[in-house]
Amino acid sequence: ELKSGDSIAILGNALPDRSQHFGWLETLLTQANAEKDLTFRNLAFSGDEVQTWHRIDNFGTRDEWLAKVKADVIFAFYGYNESFKGYEGIEEFKKNLAKFIDDAKAQNYSGKGAPRIVLFSPIALQKLANPSLPKVEDTNTNLQNYTAAMLDVAKAKGVVMVDLYQPTAKGLPEGSTLDG
């Protein structure tokens, strides 16, 4: 549940990084919570993984930026980049995700207590009729496995998780993505 005055920091990979150009998530949440005066700060970067923060020197750490934006809530979009490590990388991903959650819960970025964390799984790849693009089946199997791993960690750590994989695996309208 979002509270009045919440500052929501968005972390993760290309999905939230690209979404900042469209603003649909922020718009829908603001519209649904118009009386709550929410603030959104998108800190996502396409190359980010749960254990990495790819920025230039002296940019600041993830924790420093979460403190700068006084994060009450963290929307964490992870699992896509990590999924390229295949089945062999799942246990390391679960360990890194659990550590991220524990580390974030130990912080007080906003001065109002530990942040509330919402995990978002990767979306499924869209099958496009472009022979230049790779087949999506193997990648989607990995994405499904990483989504399941995220669900396990979310349950174990008592955080909310939004499964974006399942509804998108059923198919997206043509043109929903630029590259599948």
Regions found by a protein language model. Name each.
Residues 23-41, 48-180:
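Alpha-helical cap/lid subdomain in secreted, periplasmic
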Residues 1-4:
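N-terminal pre-domain segments of enzymes
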Residues 6-21, 46-51:
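Catalytic nucleophile-elbow at a beta strand-turn-alpha helix junction centered on a G-D-S/GDSL motif
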